[in-house]
């Protein structure tokens, strides 16, 4: 476990994000890389001459599940959410020469739930990797934060995330509102070394370019929530 875990909650609140360097040692990062390399469940794995995305990591990997519940990560998350944080989804993203895509400006608007139940304010619905995903009310998204754990050095050369600070406070944006915000706002590239963590609000506008070099950009993206869902809806990870 790294020693440079100081980060200010006041960084997350106005800007919607914070970068925490050296959270994990090199040996810990190597262990995480080894653990995800053994996952073979075809329903959650996306590959093209090598794996470039794995959904359902909380279910597929005991190591990632332990990571998500670890005090090392949750202490940072709970300081921001000001309460207990529940890991509700984890995904691996990688950019390789064979899977080197760009991601346009967007907000993260969907959550993963145990079953499809019609509840006012929830929709539309989609099915991904065998699980139900739905757009919840904005208030649910405002009570969430994501921890992006970097397994490789990440910079503009290999598709680092770009953010527009403060846009999480604008609520849910339409396509035209996103375009206008991007046109009139300055963005920031989030360069993070392996072992570092980027904390970000789901409603924060973000994008990434295709990498310009042939290298990995592996990130474990864990979503945390501080609230229960409405009606009989349950987070997919707490349905038992």
Feature locations, PLM:
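Residue-level detector of conserved, well-ordered beta-strand and adjacent loop positions
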Residues: 21, 165, 201
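Glycine- and charge-enriched low-complexity intrinsically disordered segments
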Residues: 238-240
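Non-heme Fe(II) oxygenase catalytic core, chiefly the N-lobe of the double-stranded beta-helix
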Residues: 2-15, 24-194, 207, 211-215, ...
